[in-house]
Amino acid sequence: MIFSACLPISSNDSKSKNNTSAADSQKSADYKEPKVVGTIDSDEIPESSGLVNSPCQPDVLWTHNDSGDNAFVFALDRTGKKLATFKVGGAKNTDWEDLAIRKEPAGCFLYIGEIGNNARSRSEFTVYKVKEPTVSGETNSSKKNPLSTEAAEAIKFEYPDTRHDAETLLVHPATGDIYVLSKRLSGASAVYKLKAGFDSNKTNRLEKITDFTVPAIPNGLLTGGSISPDGKRVVVCDYFAAYEIVLPKQAKNFDEIWKQKPQKIELGQRAQGEAIAYAADGKAIYASSEEKDSPLIMVERK
């Protein structure tokens, strides 16, 4: 999605400013300095909009482009080199914005968020769930000659209140619950949930859990996110940095995580950061940017 670095904050936007103050936090002490570990230099990937590291294939990362592309996902190695291009069976890319992955009894599954709505013109959205293909090394596949995934399951949903734009999709590794976080230029992001056991034969209605802010201005302009493999941490990003929240040990359920104070994680220079993911072992975070030859950034836990 096109973005200008000049963000207008109106004089009457006191709610946004108050939320920023409430969410103010210091830089996380849990992570080392960010480092560039490679470059996503394939001409087929000019806008890396979603990113995951596979728990079934730890040496493989997956990404996709933003709107304007066909229904492709791309396998990368851990330096950003493209290994394969896959066409997702039965899927359409109107505005893909984020990517999640979950290890299930039948294998690992990619969850692709058809959740963008910049013009607020859509009321129904889709998360495509497709079994992760096996990647055995670099292939000669391309957009003109792609490999194929199995047919994707289309999980349709609507919001309970209004037509949101969103760029953050999360799937809990243990429960399979799906979370969508709205993207707002002014005010808090809204956290929505679709409990596991959803019906793919109908349009499911999300449940609003809470509002959520990060220590930035704007404080709800979220562009990507990920849940850690152990299900105890969430990282989200805006265009410039990342923010992590941690589930308290005494928490009775996962949704208590949204009440926690975000800690900022520096990601270094990104032209337009829209993708972030925990490493498969949970010991690092990967990030990319919507730009040609995007750097692949890694931030390791101390």
Enumerate the predicted regions with their spans.
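C-terminal motif of bacterial Sec signal peptides marking the signal peptidase cleavage site
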Residues: 3-5
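Sequence/structural signature of beta-propeller domains
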Residues: 7-302
